[in-house]
């Protein structure tokens, strides 16, 4: 949750930033989330962002690459993103390189001579098994090995990736190229990657494009920006938006948000309280479930961590920005140590609980009841 405070005399300034703030937060949160799902499906294999040409525009490509790196991608093929954010840049040859030459072997040979330390050959321009792999092997043996170099990898961008990767792995291993990596691309996402690996695909890394950079399966991240309180005579009076849809009813007033952890350090819920309200976890802490208010529940043997941190004061940044590497490491730590595996399922994930302190819940219910008389 992000809180933006603007006093009545400058309220319009808070309103002016709404679109820009939501555009940045929604887009990059969406791409980082999608990337994390893809990275999880890859089960430790490298995932790279190959999506620039299918992004909605260049800003989406560049900032999408940044978000993908935060989400766990090891690099991007978008060179500008690499320059702007110091993200590792990776990529392979294009089909146009192969097609420019009359002979596939000549195309591979010239590429290897130009990039001997990182030769990854695209083998599906004509016939993966019939010509692509044989020519790649020939380049490895006749061009690279005499230079003291090894063929770094091959890439396939079409066909049955599970079947082809198994055939290719055997062909490479049979000629002593066990260290040659197999890179695959072609409309990949977490579901296709899971399926390929379940079928025994022999793949070392994935280049993921359109379905990552557009989050094709679920292309909207629905964060909203709503007024929750208005300054009146030096204090903030809560405001609530009522809706025909219960999920669109806003949470009123100034508030604090705490993350609640069990003894093992797992996050069990987030807790909304009134701003400044004391949260004492030394004794069982009763809370209100806004979805199932009839349930009488409490947190026991838990700890609470306040999530909000003031970043801007009187228009000035008061906290140094975190590096991209620090942000990426924070995401990795959160997902590996604090978030339950059940909450990270691709299908029907367990929902992370969002609860309320009794005082906050009572305030919200009072405002809902009062709204009936208006």
Predicted segments with their positions:
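Residue-level "edge-of-site" marker
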Residues: 95, 185, 209
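Gly/Ser/Thr/Ala-enriched C-terminal appendages of enzymes
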Residues: 175, 188-374
């Amino acid at each position: 949750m992000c809180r933006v405070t603007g006093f009545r005399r400058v309220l319009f300034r808070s309103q002016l930033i709404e679109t820009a703030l939501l555009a940045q937060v929604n887009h990059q949160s969406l791409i980082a989330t999608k990337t994390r799902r893809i990275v999880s499906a890859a089960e430790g294999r490298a995932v790279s962002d190959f999506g620039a040409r299918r992004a909605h525009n260049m800003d989406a490509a560049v900032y999408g690459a940044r978000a993908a790196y935060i989400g766990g991608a090891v690099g991007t093929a978008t060179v500008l993103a690499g320059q702007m954010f110091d993200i590792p840049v990776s990529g392979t040859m294009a089909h146009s390189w192969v097609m420019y030459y009359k002979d596939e072997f000549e195309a591979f040979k010239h590429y290897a001579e130009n990039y001997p330390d990182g030769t990854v050959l695209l083998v599906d321009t004509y016939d993966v098994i019939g010509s692509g792999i044989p020519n790649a092997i020939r380049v490895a043996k006749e061009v690279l090995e005499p230079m003291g170099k090894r063929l770094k990898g091959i890439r396939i961008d079409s066909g049955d990736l599970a079947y082809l990767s198994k055939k290719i792995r055997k062909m490479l291993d049979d000629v002593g190229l066990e260290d040659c990596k197999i890179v695959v691309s072609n409309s990949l996402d977490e579901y296709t990657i899971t399926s390929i690996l379940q079928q025994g695909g022999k793949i070392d890394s994935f280049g993921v494009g359109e379905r990552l950079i557009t989050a094709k399966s679920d292309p909207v991240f629905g964060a909203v920006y709503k007024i929750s309180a208005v300054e009146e005579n030096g204090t903030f009076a809560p405001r609530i938006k009522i809706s025909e849809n219960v999920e669109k009813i806003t949470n009123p007033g100034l508030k604090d948000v705490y993350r609640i952890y069990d003894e093992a350090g797992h996050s069990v819920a987030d807790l909304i309280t009134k701003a400044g309200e004391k949260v004492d976890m030394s004794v069982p802490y009763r809370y209100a479930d806004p979805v199932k208010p009839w349930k009488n529940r409490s947190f026991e043997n838990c700890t609470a961590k306040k999530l909000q941190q003031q970043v801007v004061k009187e228009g000035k940044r008061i906290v140094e920005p975190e590096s991209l590497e620090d942000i990426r490491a924070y995401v990795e730590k959160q997902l590996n140590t604090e978030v339950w595996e059940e909450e990270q399922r691709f299908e029907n994930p367990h929902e992370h609980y969002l609860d309320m302190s009794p005082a906050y819940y009572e305030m919200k219910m009072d405002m809902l009841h009062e709204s009936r008389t208006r």
